[in-house]
Structures are given as C-alpha cells and as structure tokens.
C-alpha cells in the first residue's frame, strides 16, 4: 500500500470510491512521473480519471465490444453528438475513416497509422465532445457485459433541479431559463465560442482578446475557430489595463469579445472586470468570464459578464 499525506490510497484508486469518479490517486511522485511520461504500467492501473486525459475503462470496454469483429487496427473516437463527428470529418478529411451510428453515440474509426489521428485526438480532447462513462455503462449493461452497475436515485425532472440549483448560485438576477447545460466545462466553452465566432463574423467583428492566463482547452478552442475566421490577441498580464485599453483604441468596433478567467487558474489573479465591461460596451463586444474554481456563487461576477461559462 502506498501512502500520501492525505491518507492511504492505492495507485489508481478513484476518489471518491465510485465507478464514475473523475479524480484518481497518484500517491507517489514516481506515479505522477509515470503518468506524465505515459508509462504503460502506470496507465494500466488507472480505471478512471479526468475524462479529457484518461479514457474511462467502461468506455474502453464499450469500444472493444463494438469493434470485436474488426480485423484492422484503428483509433476509435466515441462522440456524444453526430454533429461533432461530422465537424471532424469536414475539418480534417481523414483517409479511410469509418463511421458507425449507435444509440446516443457515433463512432469514428481512423487507421492507427494515419497522421490525422494527432489533430483528431487534440480536437476530441479540447472540445469535450466524447461520450460519458455513464453512457458506456448503459451500453455494457444492456449487452450483459456487467455483473453490477451504479444505483441511482429516481427523481422527477433532473435537469430542472440542476438548473434551479445553479441559478441560485448566480444570484437573484439569474433564473433556470438563463442556463444552458453542457457535458463539461470544455464542451460548454467549445459550443459557446463556436457560435460566438460565427455570429461575430456576420457583424464584421473578427478580433478576440485573451485577457490573462486561460485554461488550455479555452486557448485551444479559440485557436481552433478564431484563427481561421479572425484574429486572437493575447494580453498576458491581466493587470495591464493600459495594453487592454490600447487594443480597444486600435481595433474599436472590430473587437468581437474578451475572454478571461476570474480568478485565473492556478495563479488566482483577478482583472478589473468593471473596466473591461466599460471597454466592451463601447465596442459592442462580448465579455465572457470563467469563474474557475471559485464558482459563480463566490465570484459574484454574473452581472458584469455577457456570458459566464463554468
């Protein structure tokens, strides 16, 4: 048994000890190094993990079952929405790709030797468009491939309960009808930014500003869409209001929006949102804020942002 300062955890133990947990124990520095260097022995010990980085074992089992009669070696991508699979095919045009439809999933298979896998894997990771482990569990259970499964409490309209809870965290000016739910934070930003870029372009607005340090998925989503339909300008120091103001003076009505975190993760830096709000109002630009680990309840920024994505 390996130990850590937080107690006694084995390598790969889900935290909490539930099949769909997204945190997993790496109790020693050697385990962390093994994970980062993709050591096969370390990775084999991880049944679950943060979905963008670790393929849940149930998703792996589902993929293996779907491809059980297949003779060729491929990389499989299980999309939650057919539209995202179609977007990948349109964007990267992978050679010899195969698509298979299922119940609430779409499988894209690309030959392992294809160089397209690098870009497709990156898109799949940064957009958060894969299926959930619970969908995989449903598939395996219906196929008779699981001896037991997670037991869930029956509720009425679960989505309404979730929206009501989140809206209260935002404060009295936000109601459940103001919320759109996504499968993950990365997927929420991907959906938002893809639509925002198209809308801004129709209005002749092509300049997007990254204000301060942003999460990797946010950066990559901006690069994915804005780089082909506009321009992304970075303001690395979130306290550099002079630079931010000068960009608005230079680009004016061409600015589509400002994307920022409040506070930034992991440095916990906070920009002057009131100043940014004023600049965006002058240019009729969007202000998009991610309250990161602080959450909307504690950040108190909902009234200053056009969109809060979390």
Q: What is each of the regions a protein language model found here?
A:
Residues 178-310:
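Conserved PLP-enzyme active-site core in the AAT-like
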Residues 1-191, 195-197, 211-234, 241-243:
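Conserved N-terminal alpha-helix of the aminotransferase class I/II PLP-enzyme fold
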């Amino acid at each position: 048994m390996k130990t850590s300062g937080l107690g006694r955890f084995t390598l790969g133990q889900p935290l909490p000890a539930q099949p769909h947990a997204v945190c997993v124990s790496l109790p020693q520095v050697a385990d962390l190094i093994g994970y980062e260097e993709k050591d096969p022995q370390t990775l084999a010990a991880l049944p679950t993990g943060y979905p963008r980085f670790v393929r849940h074992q149930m998703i792996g089992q589902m993929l293996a079952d779907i491809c059980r009669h297949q003779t060729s070696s491929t990389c499989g991508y299980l999309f939650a929405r057919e539209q995202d699979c179609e977007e990948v095919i349109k964007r990267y045009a992978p050679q010899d790709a195969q698509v298979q439809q299922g119940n609430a999933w779409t499988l894209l298979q690309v030959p392992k030797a294809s160089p397209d896998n690098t870009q497709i894997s990156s898109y799949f990771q940064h957009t958060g468009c894969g299926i959930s482990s619970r969908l995989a569990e449903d598939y395996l259970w219906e196929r008779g491939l699981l001896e037991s499964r997670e037991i869930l409490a029956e509720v009425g309209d679960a989505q309404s309960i979730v929206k009501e809870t989140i809206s209260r965290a935002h404060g009295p000016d936000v109601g459940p009808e103001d919320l759109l739910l996504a499968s993950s934070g990365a997927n929420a930003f991907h959906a938002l930014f893809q639509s925002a870029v198209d809308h801004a372009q129709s209005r002749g607005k092509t300049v997007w500003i990254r204000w301060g340090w942003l999460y990797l998925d946010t950066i990559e989503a901006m690069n994915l869409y804005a780089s082909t339909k506009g321009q992304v300008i970075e303001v690395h120091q979130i306290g550099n209001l002079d630079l931010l103001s000068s960009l608005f003076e230079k680009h004016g009505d061409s600015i589509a929006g400002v994307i920022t975190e409040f506070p930034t993760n992991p440095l916990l830096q906070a920009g002057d949102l009131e100043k940014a709000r004023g600049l965006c109002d002058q240019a009729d630009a969007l202000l998009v804020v991610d309250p990161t680990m602080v959450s909307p309840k504690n950040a108190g920024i909902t009234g200053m942002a056009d969109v809060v994505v979390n």
